[in-house]
Structure formats: C-alpha cells, structure tokens
C-alpha cells in the first residue's frame, strides 16, 4: 500500500557497513520476551510448547547466552527497558541471565512520553549516556527493549501528531502505527549519527520483536485472506520482522533475504570478529542449510519452501534433531552441560 510520506527514509538509506534483511520471529502481536530470549541464547521456540513464555517458565539460573559469552571475555552487560521492571518478570530474569546492570522506567525521564510510553529518543539518549560514562578500558554490551510503539493503536493522544497515513483507504490504528514507525526512524538516525563519530568500534544490532496486532479488517486488505486459512508461507509473512547489523567501522554490505532471531547473535559475533563459542558455531553451520526457523516452522533450503518441523526429512531432519538435543542440553540437562 502507499502512504503520504516516506515512513523510514533513514532506515531505508542504511547500506554501508550494514547487514540488512528480514528475520522470522516466533511470536505475533505480543510476547516480546520470547524474541529477546531467542536472540540472546540462540535457542528456538520451535522446540517448546505452544503458548510458552520462557522468561516466566524456564529461566531459573544463568543460561549460556550472548550475555555469558561476552562476560567471559570481559564485557560489562547492561539491560535497558523503559517500562516497569516486573513486566514479564524481567526484574528476576535479567539478573539471572547475568546482566551486570538493569535500567527500568524509574531510570528514564518520564516527561519524554509519546502517547503513554517513553520515547525511542529518550531510550537512545540513555544508551549514549551509559556509553559516555564507561571506563576508558570498559567493553560494553547494552541490550535495550523499546516501548514507544507498543500496542494498541486505537486511542487518540494530545501529545502525538500523527504524520503518516495510508492513501486511498483509512485504517486509523494502522495510520497511528505507521506514524510511530516514522518517529522511530528519526530517533534511529540520532543513534547511528552519534556512534558514527565515536572512536571506539561499535556494532548496533536492531530488530523487531514481532509484528503489531492491528484491526482484523486490515488483514484481508493486506493479504487477501485475513488471519485465517493461510498457507504456512503466508503465515510466516506475519511472523517476519526487519533487522540490521551496522558497524561504525568498515564491514561488508550484505543483504539477507531471510534469517531468524535465534541466528542474530551468531551473526553479530561474526560481524564483531569475536570467536564463536561451540553452540554458535553449530548455529552458523546450520544456518547454511536451514536459513530460518521459528515456532511455526522452518525454511528448507533443499526444498525451497517452508515446512513444519515435524515434516522435516533427510538432512533437514538431522539438523533440527541435533538442534533440539543441544537446546535441551543448554536449557535443562544440567548434569551433562
């Protein structure tokens, strides 16, 4: 569909020193922590019961993750989320994950609000503040989960001037969401522009947690069917989010047609020139054969289509079974870790 303005001109312009593309999330419309978990651990919701929320069910001690791997080589690990600390038990989970610092809503300027939520701009300024206060020899990993564009999108707000709209048809909630994305693009330009100028090597990994839940009448307009009766490939379109990995130093420009959130930390480590731990090396190898996997299924490179995990055959089945075994060992098999 067409809009009255370019929604993400800065994001669209990012090419140099950037890997950019689309990734499968395992959730739609809600349950952000499952996306966080897939990114941080390299594990997949494909092997957990439907409806699971990992943060509330499965994290009772420190799992092997990007956090533990970076701490092992001397990084300070910081989590930032400009909302209440008890949401999805993050006040318990983040320390259990090994984060050295956590910053929640009380650590942000609560006058910097768009609709009901702290802005991306305020979050990014907090990231900059933490970077500028670091010790001279301190290596930092900062994970931040934004709130600005959180659903729903049906109320009108005095503090938000909606600039974007669809042309030729009117879905008010979609227009609000598109306007929020436009605001996010401006904040992203601030963040990248700042770190372009610093002397330290910096890598920024940016991805959507899930697609928004919008008016049910919008989806037939979008895909001709709505939310029911979809093929697996059509369903996976609803679970696809944008991502990029940008560096402020010279790195290859790359376009990725499709990956999944469980692979992003491996891509980030490779891009940063950090030696891959054994689990991430397995994921890097698996990625060559199965480029994307999530709670709904996987993309089979050999067959050129999406399949349900239970329908995997041949080498696909071997990769997925080994992945499931390694994930079980990573999550539950404390005796044999």
Give residue spans per PLM region.
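Solvent-exposed soluble domains appended to multi-pass membrane proteins
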Residues: 1-337
């Amino acid at each position: 569909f067409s809009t009255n303005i370019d929604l993400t001109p800065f994001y669209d312009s990012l090419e140099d020193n950037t890997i950019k593309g689309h990734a499968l999330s395992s959730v739609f419309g809600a349950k952000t922590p499952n996306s966080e978990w897939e990114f941080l651990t390299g594990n997949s919701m494909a092997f957990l019961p439907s409806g699971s929320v990992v943060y509330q069910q499965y994290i009772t001690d420190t799992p092997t993750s990007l956090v533990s791997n970076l701490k092992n080589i001397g990084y300070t690990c910081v989590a930032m989320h400009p909302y209440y600390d008890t949401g999805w038990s993050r006040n318990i989970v983040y320390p259990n994950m090994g984060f050295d610092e956590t910053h929640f809503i009380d650590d942000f300027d609560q006058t910097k609000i768009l609709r009901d939520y702290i802005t991306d701009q305020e979050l990014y300024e907090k990231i900059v503040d933490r970077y500028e206060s670091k010790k001279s020899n301190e290596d930092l990993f900062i994970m931040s989960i934004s709130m600005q564009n959180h659903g729903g999108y049906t109320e009108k707000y005095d503090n938000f001037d909606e600039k974007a709209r669809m042309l030729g048809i009117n879905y008010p909630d979609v227009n609000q969401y598109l306007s929020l994305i436009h605001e996010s693009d401006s904040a992203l330009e601030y963040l990248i522009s700042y770190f372009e100028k610093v002397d330290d090597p910096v890598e920024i990994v940016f991805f959507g947690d899930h697609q928004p839940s919008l008016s049910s009448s919008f989806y037939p307009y979008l895909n001709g069917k709505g939310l029911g009766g979809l093929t697996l490939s059509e369903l996976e379109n609803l679970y696809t989010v944008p991502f990029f990995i940008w560096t402020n130093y010279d790195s290859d420009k790359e376009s990725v047609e499709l990956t999944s959130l469980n692979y992003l930390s491996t891509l980030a480590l490779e891009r940063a020139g950090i030696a891959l731990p054994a689990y991430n090396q397995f994921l890097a190898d698996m990625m060559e054969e199965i480029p994307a996997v999530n709670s709904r299924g996987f993309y089979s490179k050999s067959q050129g289509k999406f399949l349900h995990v239970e329908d995997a055959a041949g080498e696909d089945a071997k990769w997925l079974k080994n992945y499931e075994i390694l994930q079980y060992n990573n999550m539950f098999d404390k005796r044999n870790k």
